[in-house]
């Protein structure tokens, strides 16, 4: 018994000595560990934190723990990372294990113009304002990583996701991405530039094997990513779904190690696109840091937490414990993740952020106004002269349809969205009568992953009936403004599908041509993130490229149409 007591006392003594060793000589306070000392260099903090972590804690840090979060190290007080979709606004909160809306009442955001519109401004100051505002909204919502911006090159006008990118010019994309990143990261939020690399179509995006020359790779498809790393200092990059030279981009040695790390000196985190990892050993050795996915709710894959079955989770741990791989690569991955955490969630000086503020709405409006493009103005039909106009006819579903919901991962739940019709009515006021006719019926749905627009766009009238009403309204108007184009439905401007053709859907060409016959002051406003065919171009005097403009869409379009703002945008891709 005495022997056991001695052993216990000896053990307690060692514990006491260990505890006392953590106390500083000055003032009797506990010494701050290096990794928690904000006065130490980040690399020192990373090294110290890494040295304190167990193998299991390290592996837990390199894969998802929910749809939009990854683990920290609770034992050491290192917080988890939270991410959000957000090319054009911070996405609504979703449930832990799926993408359905979580039904919060505090997650309505400002919707900013699509990045095609930002690129059309050709104004780096607008890119900085965009990044600063969206970064502030992400920070307020306690997001550490904003999964944006997208800089994939506009290679085909049929790519359903072109609206999320910055056009076909590598130089323009490289110029605009840098201030966007700086604006976001000033808020203590990491920009995550995507999709690296060569993800230029949605059709078969998971299986397409891209083959191209090095000259095309370096001169066309990589400049924006290189600028993001070397000039913008982006803290994270998202891998893409496709393959490059037979190897998936999310664990492609040429892209992630040879170019990104060795040539460009990237020191941030490579995040997989959701479900983009396919091979544990390639992910270990070829530069993937943090695996995310969408194939599990975390609960229904047997007795283990299903997230532990990710390629960089339990399978990785098993390989290490069996001695089949070492821990050098793991330490590199965890170091990158720790560096990101110290830059974001553990930065004590990060701002508080703000959400849905008037200033953010104003920034969105200014970006929209600078990005709107005047494609044609024969006979100086524009701007609308409110001193002469008595009646303005507004035609087209896109005059009333909300465009912030839908389109894939960029779908938003907004604080407000001003439609083109409401914006024009508000600006015109009592100076003229504004009369609306629908003209055509597109996609009546108004829901995406549980986020609802609240609009009921069902209309059982035939195409002929809708057209007849539009012509009746238009024939005696002083101006006719047709708001048409694309929307965020599948096979239009939408993730995970490409367009079926270059033409306008819903028989809009017929409506436009018939309107041109009854009124010579016809203005067509094309709302899209893509080029469209315009077989009626010689019939219509005025054409405006209106993009997807976000919360202030209607206000910005009205300002341009009546001449309050100059349509100074330039096309970032070929029409």
Residue ranges and their predicted role:
Residues 22-575:
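Glycoside hydrolase catalytic-domain context in secreted enzymes
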């Amino acid at each position: 018994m005495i022997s056991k007591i001695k052993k216990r006392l000896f053990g307690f003594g060692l514990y006491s000595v260990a505890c006392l060793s953590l106390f500083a000589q000055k003032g009797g306070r506990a010494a701050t560990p290096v990794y928690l000392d904000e006065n130490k260099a980040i690399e020192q903090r990373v090294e110290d934190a890494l040295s304190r972590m167990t193998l299991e804690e390290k592996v837990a840090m390199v894969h998802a723990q929910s749809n939009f979060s990854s683990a920290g190290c609770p034992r050491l007080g290192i917080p988890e990372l939270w991410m959000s979709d957000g090319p054009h606004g911070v996405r609504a909160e979703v449930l832990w294990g799926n993408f359905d809306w979580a039904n919060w009442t505090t997650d309505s955001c400002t919707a900013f113009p699509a990045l095609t519109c930002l690129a059309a401004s050709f104004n780096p100051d607008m890119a900085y304002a965009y990044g600063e505002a969206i970064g502030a909204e992400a920070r307020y919502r306690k997001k550490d990583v904003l999964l944006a911006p997208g800089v994939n090159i506009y290679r085909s006008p049929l790519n359903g996701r072109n609206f999320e990118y910055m056009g076909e010019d590598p130089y323009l994309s490289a110029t605009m991405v840098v201030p966007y990143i700086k604006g976001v990261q000033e808020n203590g939020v990491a920009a995550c530039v995507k999709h690296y690399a060569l993800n230029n179509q949605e059709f078969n995006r998971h299986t397409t094997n891209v083959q191209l020359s090095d000259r095309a790779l370096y001169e066309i498809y990589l400049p924006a990513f290189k600028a993001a790393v070397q000039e913008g200092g982006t803290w994270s990059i998202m891998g893409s779904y496709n393959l490059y030279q037979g190897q998936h981009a999310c664990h492609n040695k040429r892209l992630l190690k040879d170019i990104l790390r060795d040539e460009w000196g990237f020191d941030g985190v490579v995040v997989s696109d959701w479900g983009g990892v396919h091979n544990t050993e390639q992910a270990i050795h070829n530069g993937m840091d943090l695996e995310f996915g969408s194939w599990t709710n975390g609960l229904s894959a047997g007795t283990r937490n299903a997230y532990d079955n990710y390629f960089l989770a339990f399978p990785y741990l098993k390989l290490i414990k069996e001695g089949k791989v070492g821990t050098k690569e793991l330490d590199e991955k965890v170091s990158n993740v720790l560096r990101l955490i110290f830059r974001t969630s553990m930065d004590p000086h990060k701002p508080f952020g703000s959400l849905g503020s008037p200033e953010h709405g104003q920034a969105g409006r200014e970006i929209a106004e600078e990005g709107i493009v005047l494609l044609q103005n024969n006979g100086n039909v524009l701007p609308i002269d409110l001193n002469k106009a008595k009646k303005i006819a507004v035609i087209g579903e896109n005059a009333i349809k909300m465009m912030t919901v839908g389109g894939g991962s960029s779908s938003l739940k907004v604080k407000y969205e001003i439609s083109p019709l409401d914006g024009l009515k508000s600006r015109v006021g009592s100076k003229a009568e504004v009369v609306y006719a629908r003209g055509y019926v597109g996609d009546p749905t108004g829901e995406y992953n549980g986020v609802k627009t609240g609009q009921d766009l069902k209309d059982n009238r035939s195409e002929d009936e809708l057209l007849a009403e539009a012509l009746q309204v238009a024939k005696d108007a002083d101006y006719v403004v047709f708001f048409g184009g694309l929307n965020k439905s599948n096979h239009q401007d939408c993730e995970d599908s490409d367009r079926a053709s270059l033409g306008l859907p819903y028989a809009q060409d017929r409506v436009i041509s018939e309107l041109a016959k009854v009124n010579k002051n016809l203005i067509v406003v094309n709302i899209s993130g893509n080029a469209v065919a315009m077989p009626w171009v010689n019939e219509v005097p005025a054409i405006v490229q209106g993009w997807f403009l976000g919360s202030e869409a209607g206000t910005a379009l009205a300002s341009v149409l009546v001449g309050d703002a100059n349509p100074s945008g330039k096309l970032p891709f070929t029409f």
